[in-house]
Amino acid sequence: LYYIQEPSAMTPANVLPIEEGDVVFDMCAAPGGKSTELAAKLNKTGLIITNDISNSRAKALLKNVEVFGVPNLCVLNEDPVGIASRFSGFFDKVLIDAPCSGEGMFRKDNKLIKAWEKNGPEFYSQIQRNIILAGADMLKPGGKLLYSTCTFSKLEDEDSVIHLLTNRPDMHLIDIKPYEGFSHGFDTDEGYHLEKAVRIFPHKMPGEGHFVALFEKDGEDYTSSKRPVSGKTKLPDELKEFMDSTTFEYDPAYINIRDTRVFLTSPYMAEERGLRIIRNGLLLGELKKNRFEPSQAFAMALTKDQFNNCLDLSVSDDRVIRYLKGETIDIDDFNVKSGWTLVCVDGYPLGWGKNANGQLKNKYLAGWRWM
């Protein structure tokens, strides 16, 4: 239902204007707080591709977006610079929360000072410049790019902005809606309008140090990123039977069965080959010996009224904790049909169970269970 973030860190995803139906790229996304806000703005439309260069962080990113029930997703584990040519002019919006020297976080975590001594602004500035150019190249004409860091370094902030504007003349800075505590970027007399960028200082706002700049790409785009499909897809009977028990909206043409796992992929997703993909689309579940078992991710993507058999527990019911720990629970006091059951808490889906004679066999994902 919510993701706790440091106040200043909430600013980038809040400032980037997302419209329903957009194709969005979160380039340096782990652990996923910004991706969840971007996905919330999309409201299960369009596509969000969320990426991290670290494999372990990308897997943590996947869990966070699946916890939030994001169906229209693709999670990558790529060097964002290396895939720029694959997604040239593809995205309506790009968010770059760039790796940085972290000067704005020293007050919160003084261990970062030692990391800064090892790799400071000079180290990160070159990485940032490559990333910001790649982000601009992946943006459609008329699209918007948000660049942010959690550092005070002018080399990593305003100088990165100047690097983009100098090397991509079709990009320009645009104004960010004022907010109490925002400060202007450090301007120069070179005509780059750096006052349109925003600096956040901890003595002016209840958060740590941050820098945010919003760009727009010249031109207008009339092309769709949707990929065409041909013909109709016949679903296995056991899968169709389960999907018919839901009112979840989907296009069978985008059902993709890989070995035994069933995915609902996005009509916007580009060709997969050659990409390190952690997850492409919503994992619906798995086909096992003439039966279909729905996934944890599918449960999180549903609403209570989209499945025909629900157990809705109160948040104060001690069975909620027992369910989260993976225990079988007694549900004799509920009018729940036998078979697959969507377990909810105050109307919000939590996972699956299988009811047999008033005993709910626990199907909560093992890796998510409380110890």
Features from the language model and the residues they span:
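Mobile active-site "lid"/loop adjacent to the S-adenosyl-L-methionine
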Residues: 56, 92-133, 150-157, 180
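Helix-to-beta-strand junctions that scaffold the AdoMet/dcAdoMet cofactor pocket
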Residues: 42-43, 139-141
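Class I S-adenosyl-L-methionine
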Residues: 91, 144-147, 152-263
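S-adenosyl-L-methionine
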Residues: 51-89
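Polybasic, low-complexity RNA-engagement segments
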Residues: 208-211, 216-371
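Conserved SAM-binding loop of SAM-dependent methyltransferases across substrates and taxa
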Residues: 31-44
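Conserved class I S-adenosyl-L-methionine
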Residues: 21-30
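A short acidic, Gly/Pro-enriched loop at the edge of an enzyme's catalytic core
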Residues: 19-20, 84-97
